Amino acid sequence: IVAAHTAKVMVNDFLDTKKMAFPRFFFLSNDELLEILSEGKDPLRVQPFMKKCFEAVQKVEFTERVTMKTIVSVEGESVPLCKEIDPAETGAVEKWMLEFEDVMKASLLKVTRESVVSYTTKPREEWILDWPGQVVIAGSQVHWTKEVTDAIVAGGLKEYGEKSNVQLTNIVNMVRGELTKLERATMSALVTIDVHARDVVVQMSADGVHDPKDFKWLAQLRYFWEDDTLKCRMINAQAQYGFEYLGNSARLVI
């Protein structure tokens, strides 16, 4: 009995070291973690546990050389990794899982950067269809923040409210048209965001907001692309966007 207890304590201590090396292992039971560690040299057999560590990741696509190349969401959306990951080269499972986490975030950062830059190069309705749903929401909010700020300074909130109505109508018309399941999910989420954004602008116009430092504007969740990253601000609080992949799920709240 003593020997069995000692062995159990040693196993738990061993698993704790793995969890500390890759904290997302805390989402797994000890039995699941033991199974992952036993299969760690074969990433294809670890695949079923990816979703428990990364909620939006249904699976990862591999190359013929068994390097990780693409994230696939629960909804079937694909996002290419900015760098292929070779689990065999990295070694221990917690090390290549940690590398996957870093590369996932770097990939979302890269795609978001590209989307923000390309926003002004084509009609918004076309731009929306070029990017993953999460990136569309983030990129759109960056430009909304800038455009509303410019409208406040120029005294053009009323006109921007009218522009917001036109944009919203265009998106609703697209939702009613022929779209793929993923495109429709992106559009539906964007409608929720755009309705809220329109209402904010209309209310600020009615309240006579004319200063970007007005509390009514500062109290809104605003997105900024600064220092090559995405920052979110509200009143005097600021947080960096985490670039955790969220998939293309519905947005119930802003």
Predicted regions and their residues:
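Amphipathic alpha-helical packing elements
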Residues: 4-57
